Every structure is written in C-alpha cells, then in structure tokens.
Amino acid sequence: FSYMEIREATISDKNSILKFCKNTFSWGDYIEKVWSSWLDEGNLFLFEKKSPVGICHAFYSENQIWIEGIRIDPEHRREMIASKLVTYAESIGKKNHKLFSYMLIDTENKNSISMANSLNYDTFETWNYYSLTPKKNLNFKIEFEKSVDSEIFTFYVDSWRWIRTTKQILTDLSSQNKIIKSNLNGKKTNAIIGNYKHIDNTLIVTLSSGSFDTLSNVLSYLQNFAFENNYERIQILTNKKLEFFDSLDYKISFYLMKKSLH
C-alpha cells in the first residue's frame, strides 16, 4: 500500500502541478492563470502519491458546490483519483449543508462524463460557449432590466461558475446595471454581464436569446461596451444555439452536470 492523501495545495506545489496542466485542451490550459486566485480562495485539493498527481478546486456558495479544474497526471489515469477528489470536495460541502453539486464537462469528453455519471451526476442542461470580438459598434438600442424573472435566468455564470440565481442575486445584479435587455415585437433577449474574476480584461456574459433582431442589439451593445472599457475578449454562455453574427464564434458545448447531496 503506497502512501497517498488528499490535502490543500500550497504555493510550493505549483510547479509539480503545472507539469500535468499543460496540454489539457488544443490551445493549452488555463490553470496557470487561475492558480494564485484559487489558492487564495482555498479548497484547492491535491491528491498526493509521493508527489502531486491530481488536483480539483471546489467553490462553495449559498447551498451549492461548484467543482472545477479537475486535472490528473496522465501517468496516473484510471486510478479513480478524479472520483476521490470530487468525493472529498462533496464531503466538505455536505458537512456545511450544501444541497447540490455541479460541474461543467465538454460534451465530447466521454471519460469525464462517465466519471461524473459513476458518482451519480446527471446531465442537467447543455450550454454553448461563444466568443465575440470587442469593437466600436453603435448599432444598438438596449435597456437596463430593472426586475428580471428567475425563470429567464435560473443560473448565471460568474467566472465560469454556474450559480443558481435567487431573487436577491438578480436584484443585486440589476441594481448594478449588470442585466440588459432588448425588446422588439414581443420578443426579448436578456444578458447578464460580469467580469472574469481570475483572468483580466475578460467579459463573461450569460445570455438568453429571443429573436435575431433583439440578439443583434445585445451583441452590438456588448461589443461596444467591451471596446470602450478596454476588454480584450467577450465570452458568451447560452442554452441556445445562436444565429450567425459578425465576429461571433462558436467554440464548444458543455453539459452542466448536477448531483443532489441530500
């Protein structure tokens, strides 16, 4: 029986962990960029066998757990390390009376989906990720939404974490002018605008699209808002497939996975 344990990561673990967080996606990985923020937030769990071979970050809010950044050293795949890390994160959530656990998995990632299924996570919703290029664009008419129905936004995305909305959360967002809408011919598109806490100059938008004309209004506003406020990129997350719009680029689809803990 070889020595192994789960513990909180520390500053000195960085290099040994980043070694296996290099080529996760075709473009690389984001772990290096968020490393110090996640360390500050705490609950960055590390699986150690002589040296670190896996990590997973958990974010606890209201009554939910958000699980993110599961990375396993390729030499230690199929050792159930991901499952053990997730189960550990859940156990801390349960002690603190959290009711649900969520994670986001690329719809093509069969291994992660079966790992989540084996831990009783269900495919709850599908979300699509688009990027939009910031640029000067005055071709819009939008309004700030004063009161928004939680049926339009059951979740909003805060720094790539799907947070279940409450009346209070939506009221706070609208009082900060973070919720915009375009309303034409009885159809409307709404968007919640946020910053990516861990990566600079990135606008994250949760979008609910009603028609092409209202969508165009909102996308044009977002482009211009990002341009005027020196954002480098706009990341849009939505349940629907969006129609063609200049410099809107479909990236990838995800399953929002959900597990009840009670």
Model-derived features: where do they sit?
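Conserved GNAT acetyl-CoA-binding A-motif
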Residues: 93-108, 228-238
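Conserved N-terminal entry element of GNAT/NAT acetyltransferase domains
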Residues: 1-11, 134-147, 262
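Conserved active-site alpha-helix within GNAT-family acetyltransferase domains
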Residues: 83, 107-125, 240-252
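A conserved beta-strand-loop-helix scaffold within acyl/acetyltransferase catalytic domains
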Residues: 22, 28-45, 54-70, 191-200
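Glycine-rich acetyl-CoA-binding "A-motif" of GNAT/NAT acetyltransferases
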Residues: 50-54, 111, 188-190
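Conserved acetyl-CoA-binding loop-helix of GNAT-fold acetyltransferases
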Residues: 72, 78-91, 114, 213-224
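Conserved catalytic-core motifs of GNAT/GCN5-like acyltransferases
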Residues: 60-63, 102-104, 122-135, 249-261
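Amide-forming acyltransferase catalytic core, primarily the GNAT-like/NAT-type
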Residues: 119-199
